[in-house]
């Protein structure tokens, strides 16, 4: 005879008598099974039904029933109570606050830019130096910049090719040698609000802007450089009509335009250059470098849709230059709209930002200045103010150098 089948029949008969015809207790069920593990499995469904029917676990997860609850065993790459969270970097950046990579075991590995370290939660980034890049350390009352901060929890960057509705623009003529860019329709910045911004003085005072990338180097637009013209960099500048204690002046000892830049062929293609300073800057709350991510993340940050531009350029088309540092939030413009807005060639190393309705833009004198995207309280360089057709004109946009194309350089 088959003792297994006989035992199963005996248990089934006792179970029906003890727990189905009448309500039984756990102890009574235990007497039937004579095994705690089997009793537990039975009891989970007997008390409140099978919580795994239908299966609440998503993305191929396996369901384990429990009393008044259940547990999902998730497939690799998913997590959460119902395996609903993509544990890779594609969704909400893997919950990393700066950079995310997927390791060999398919687990998310968060990391931080230079000057930051991972917090104990292994997601956030904490400053590791007194004046880390991209952070505003001067205390201000709440500003537009702070309120507009982008957080990864609102962003699935796998869908980041979509951009926000058209907002404001930055411009400079591709034809005229004196059509440098300025901020039109912007706001007065607060002292120390854009501590990476520098002013370039040459044979014309305040002719361009730039961004601090470390104590010895500044990045600007290549078309701002003229052979034989001495350039002075002013960091910590705020009001150009006053000499302020926050200012630091350095001479440029070497200007390095990108090796593909050729002004005789096209003045604004590959419009990026590095400036080496004669003495290191002293970093403080008013003189702080901008963060630069790798190529992938610089492109991701740009596609978030909105960035900030700043400078001392003209405050209206063909008007006077600003004396107080100006800033403006500008939306990224999709490439098709950008190409339709002009007869001038827009190369793949450029992008458009600004407002279709006009009235706000960068303008003459802003060239070389930063286009930054603030992410989780840290600002990253995503563009360089390059050119445009006039300033703040309806249907025209500001054209910027796409920094992601030059990070490795």
UniProtKB/Swiss-Prot annotation:
Ca(2+) 1 binds at residues 1, 7, 18, 22. It comes from Sus scrofa (Pig). The modification Phosphothreonine is found at residue 161. One of its GO terms (cellular component) is extracellular space. Mg(2+) 3 binds at residues 37, 41. InterPro entries: Coagulation_fac-like_Gla_dom, EGF-like_Ca-bd_dom, EGF-like_dom, EGF-type_Asp/Asn_hydroxyl_site, EGF_Ca-bd_CS, GLA-like_dom_SF, GLA_domain, Pept_S1A_FX. Ca(2+) 6 binds at residues 37, 41. The modification (3R)-3-hydroxyaspartate is found at residue 65. This is Coagulation factor IX. Residues 148-182 form a propeptide. Residues 1-47 form the Gla domain. It is an enzyme of class 3 (hydrolase). Residues 48-84, 85-126 form the EGF-like domain. Ca(2+) 5 binds at residues 27, 31. The modification 4-carboxyglutamate is found at residues 7-8, 16, 18, 21-22, 27-28, 31, 34, 37, 41. Ca(2+) 7 binds at residues 48-49, 51, 65-66. Belongs to the peptidase S1 family. Ca(2+) 3 binds at residues 8, 18, 28, 31. Ca(2+) 8 binds at residues 237, 239, 242, 244, 247. The modification Sulfotyrosine is found at residue 157. Heterodimer of a light chain and a heavy chain; disulfide-linked. Interacts (inactive and activated) with F11 (activated) in calcium-dependent manner. Interacts with SERPINC1. Its EC number is 3.4.21.22. PANTHER family: COAGULATION FACTOR, COAGULATION FACTOR IX. Residues 183-409 form the Peptidase S1 domain. Ca(2+) 4 binds at residues 16, 21. The keyword Secreted applies.
């Amino acid at each position: 005879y088959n003792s297994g089948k006989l035992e199963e029949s005996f248990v089934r008969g006792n179970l029906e008598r003890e727990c189905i015809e009448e309500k039984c207790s756990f102890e009574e069920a235990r007497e039937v099974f004579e095994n705690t593990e089997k009793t537990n499995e039975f009891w989970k469904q007997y008390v409140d039904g099978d919580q795994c029917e239908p299966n609440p676990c998503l993305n191929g997860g396996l369901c384990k029933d429990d009393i008044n609850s259940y547990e999902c065993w998730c497939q690799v790459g998913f997590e959460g109570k119902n395996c609903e969270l993509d544990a890779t970097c594609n969704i909400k950046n893997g919950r990393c606050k700066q950079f995310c990579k997927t390791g060999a075991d398919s687990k998310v590995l968060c990391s931080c830019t230079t000057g930051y370290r991972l917090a104990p939660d292994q997601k956030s980034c904490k400053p590791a130096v007194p004046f880390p890049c991209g952070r505003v350390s001067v205390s201000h009352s709440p500003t537009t910049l702070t309120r507009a901060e982008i957080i990864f929890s609102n962003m699935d960057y796998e869908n980041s090719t979509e951009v926000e509705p058209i907002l404001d623009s930055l411009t400079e003529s591709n034809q005229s040698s004196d059509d440098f860019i300025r901020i039109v329709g912007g706001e007065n910045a607060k002292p120390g609000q854009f501590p990476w911004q520098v002013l370039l003085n040459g044979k014309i005072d305040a002719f361009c802007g730039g961004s601090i990338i470390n104590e010895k180097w500044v990045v600007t637009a290549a078309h701002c450089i003229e052979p034989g013209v001495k350039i002075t960099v002013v960091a910590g500048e705020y009001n150009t009509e006053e000499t302020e204690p926050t200012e630091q002046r350095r001479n440029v000892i070497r200007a390095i335009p990108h090796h593909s830049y050729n002004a005789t062929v096209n003045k604004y293609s590959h419009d990026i250059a590095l400036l080496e300073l004669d003495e290191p800057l002293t970093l403080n709350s008013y003189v702080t470098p901008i963060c630069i991510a790798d190529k992938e993340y610089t492109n991701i940050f740009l596609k978030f849709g909105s960035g900030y531009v700043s400078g001392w350029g003209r405050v209206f088309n063909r008007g006077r230059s600003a004396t107080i540092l100006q800033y403006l939030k500008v939306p990224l413009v999709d490439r098709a709209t950008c190409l339709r807005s002009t007869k001038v060639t827009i190369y793949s190393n450029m992008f458009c930002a600004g407002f279709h309705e006009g009235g706000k833009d960068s303008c003459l004198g802003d060239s070389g200045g930063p286009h930054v995207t603030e992410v989780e309280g840290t600002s990253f360089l995503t563009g360089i103010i390059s050119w445009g057709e006039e300033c703040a004109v309806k249907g025209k946009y500001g054209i910027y150098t796409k920094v992601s194309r030059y990070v490795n350089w």
